[in-house]
C-alpha cells in the first residue's frame, strides 16, 4: 500500500481528522463524566492522574525544541512551553490544573507528590515523552495532532460539569476555558507542519500510525483509571489496599 500515490493535502487532512473516532472523548470513563454518572472519587482520580500528563507536556515540547533546527518553528513552538509552565510572573496551565484539583477537593501538595498516579498512566505518559525525545522533530510535533479533537472535549466539560457536579468550585474550570483557544491555535501550527512534511504515501501512513500511537496513550490512561476507580481493581488490589506502586524512578 505504501507504493500507492500520496494523498492530496485535503485527503490527508481528512484521514487525520477521521482518527477522531478513536479519541478518548468516546472512552466510557469520559462518557460517564460528561453524562453526570461519575462519582467524586472518579473525578478526583482523573484529575490526579491527568496531572502527571500535564506536568510532562512541557518536557515533551522541550524535546521537540531541542531536536528542531528550524528557528522559525522553535519561535512558535516555544509558546506551548509558556502555556503550561507560565511566562515570568504569570501562571500557566500547570497552576490552572492545580486549581482544578483544589476545586474537586484535592490538596495541591498531594497532586505534586504524584502519589495517586497509577502505574499504567505513568507508563503511558512516559512513553509519549520518550517518543518525543527519540523521534524526528516533525514526527514528535505531528503526534500532538490529537489537539484536532481537543476543543470538543474541553467544551463538553464546560457544558456538562457545572450542571452535574455542583460540588465542584467553578473557579476550577479556568484550565478548560483557556485551552479552548490555545488548542485551536496549536492545531493550525501542528497541522501545517504535518501537511508540509508528509508528502509520500509511506510517510502519510506512518503519520497516521503515529497519531494512533498518541490516541492509544490517551485511551490506555483511561483504561488504567477505569480499573482503579470504576471496577475497584487498582494495582495489587488482590493482596493489599495500600498504594504500594512506585511513585516514579528518577534516572
Swiss-Prot record:
Entry keyword set: Oxidoreductase, PQQ biosynthesis
Protein name: Pyrroloquinoline-quinone synthase
Biological function: Ring cyclization and eight-electron oxidation of 3a-(2-amino-2-carboxyethyl)-4,5-dioxo-4,5,6,7,8,9-hexahydroquinoline-7,9-dicarboxylic-acid to PQQ.
Enzyme Commission number(s) of this protein: 1.3.3.11
Top EC class for this record: oxidoreductase
Organism: Pseudomonas putida (strain GB-1)
Family, as annotated: Belongs to the PqqC family.
Taxonomic superkingdom: Bacteria
GO molecular function, one term: pyrroloquinoline-quinone synthase activity
Example of a GO biological process term: sulfur compound metabolic process
Pathway linked to the protein: Cofactor biosynthesis; pyrroloquinoline quinone biosynthesis
Gene name of this polypeptide: pqqC
This protein's record includes keyword Ligase: no
Catalytic function, reaction form: 6-(2-amino-2-carboxyethyl)-7,8-dioxo-1,2,3,4,7,8-hexahydroquinoline-2,4-dicarboxylate + 3 O2 = pyrroloquinoline quinone + 2 H2O2 + 2 H2O + H(+)
Amino acid at each position: 500500500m505504501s507504493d500507492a500515490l500520496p494523498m492530496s493535502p485535503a485527503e490527508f487532512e481528512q484521514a487525520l481528522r477521521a482518527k477522531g473516532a478513536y479519541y478518548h472523548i468516546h472512552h466510557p470513563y469520559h462518557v460517564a463524566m460528561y453524562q453526570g454518572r461519575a462519582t467524586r472519587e472518579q473525578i478526583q482520580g482523573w484529575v490526579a492522574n491527568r496531572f502527571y500528563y500535564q506536568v510532562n507536556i512541557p518536557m515533551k515540547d522541550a524535546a521537540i525544541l531541542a531536536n528542531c533546527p528550524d528557528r522559525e518553528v522553535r519561535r512558535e513552538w516555544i509558546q506551548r512551553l509558556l502555556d503550561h509552565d507560565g511566562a515570568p510572573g504569570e501562571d500557566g496551565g500547570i497552576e490552572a490544573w492545580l486549581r482544578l484539583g483544589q476545586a474537586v477537593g484535592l490538596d495541591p501538595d498531594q497532586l505534586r507528590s504524584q502519589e495517586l498516579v497509577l502505574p499504567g498512566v505513568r507508563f503511558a505518559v512516559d512513553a509519549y515523552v520518550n517518543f518525543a525525545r527519540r523521534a524526528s522533530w516533525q514526527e514528535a510535533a505531528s503526534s500532538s495532532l490529537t489537539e484536532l479533537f481537543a476543543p470538543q472535549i474541553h467544551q463538553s466539560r464546560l457544558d456538562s460539569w457545572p450542571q452535574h457536579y455542583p460540588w465542584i468550585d467553578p473557579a476550577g474550570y479556568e484550565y478548560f476555558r483557556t485551552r479552548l483557544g490555545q488548542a485551536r491555535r496549536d492545531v493550525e501550527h501542528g497541522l501545517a507542519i504535518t501537511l508540509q512534511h508528509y508528502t509520500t504515501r509511506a510517510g502519510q501512513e506512518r503519520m497516521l500510525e503515529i497519531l494512533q500511537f498518541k490516541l492509544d496513550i490517551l485511551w490506555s490512561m483511561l483504561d488504567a483509571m477505569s480499573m482503579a476507580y470504576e471496577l475497584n481493581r487498582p494495582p495489587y488490589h488482590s493482596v493489599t489496599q495500600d498504594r504500594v506502586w512506585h511513585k516514579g524512578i528518577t534516572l
